[in-house]
Regions:
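Short pre-active-site segment immediately N-terminal to redox-active cysteine/selenocysteine motifs
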Residues: 1-2, 71
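Nucleotide phosphate-binding site architecture
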Residues: 4, 14, 85
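Thiol/disulfide oxidoreductase modules built on the thioredoxin-like
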Residues: 47-52, 59-102
Length: 104
């Protein structure tokens, strides 16, 4: 990925998904990669980090507009009622994110 922090947090995200995926729904959303680099680069990233979570493509930028994405990465925690619980702009701290996931 052209996004260094995205690649940096990818292994921790994989780990958290493996540990919390049965209780918390994880969705990775690719905002620019498919448009600028092609779907092959997105697939390559997912395979490199062995992600098993769904990866959605925001080709029209609708999701990034909805959640006011202005930098990458961004992590959005949404509770079971669809309410945004917490937003992390930039690379997340794995320990902090794990504590927040445990509370959802």
């Amino acid at each position: 990925s052209w996004c260094g922090p995205c690649a940096s947090e990818a292994p921790a995200l994989k780990d958290l998904h493996e540990r919390y995926g049965d209780r918390v729904e994880f969705l990775a959303i690719n905002v620019t990669g498919a448009e600028f680099f092609g779907i092959d680069k997105v697939t390559e990233f997912v395979e490199k980090y062995e992600w098993q979570m769904p990866v959605l493509l925001d080709e029209k930028g609708e999701v990034s507009q909805e959640y006011k994405v202005y930098a990458f990465p961004i992590t959005v925690l949404i509770d079971r009622n669809g309410v945004v619980n917490h937003v992390i702009h930039g690379e997340f701290d794995p320990e902090d994110l794990e504590k927040r996931l445990a509370k959802l």
